[in-house]
Amino acid sequence: MLYQLSYRRRSGEGYRPGIYPSRAMQRPGPIATVVGIFAALLIALLVYGVVKSGPDTSLDSAVSRDAKPVAPGAAVALRRLGSPGTTSLAALHGKVVVLNFWASWCDPCRREAPILERAQRRLRTRNATVLGVTYKDYAADSAKFVRELKLTYPSLRDDKLQLAPKYGTIKLPETFVINRAGRVVAISRGELTEPFLTRALDRALAGSAS
């Protein structure tokens, strides 16, 4: 509140000098009003942005309804880990794919890797594959992880986070089973279990390519 020297009449008295709130400052002017509105809009946008930045659960919702949504980011080509060239989900169309997001610093990823390796050995002759995708990991650390666990399934490097956000991935590990038609039929957010993967693969392998 701003104050200024002014004169006011008191009951039964004349005008007496004193420091009183300035009337000119008691009512906001047009500029202050505009600034206030702008600030309110900015706060609203920030709140909306925080809400929207959360994980995308639309894929989970569709899979829970057995809608078999199209696998996101099929055209995204990522560099292979430990070998030259790139690979995309589109290049694997017609195969059942177990898409697994992982990192060397992720303890649950280390625990579930043997499950994925056993699945890979089972899938080799069935036109299917496990496909790992590293998430926020150094290539050297990822390569060491693969060597230590003797993993034979291929992995790609999502260094620029081109694929993971399309699946709503913000925590590891996460696994998506994709059928021959390129549609997601099962999702595991968190450490994978062998019974879950076995059931999901049996369903995907038994399904049609359409």
Residue ranges of model-derived segments:
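Structural microenvironment flanking redox-active thiols in thiol-disulfide oxidoreductases
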Residues: 110-149, 159-166
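A short beta-strand-turn-helix
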Residues: 70, 75-97
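Short active-site neighborhood of thiol/selenol oxidoreductases, capturing the structured segment around
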Residues: 87-110, 116
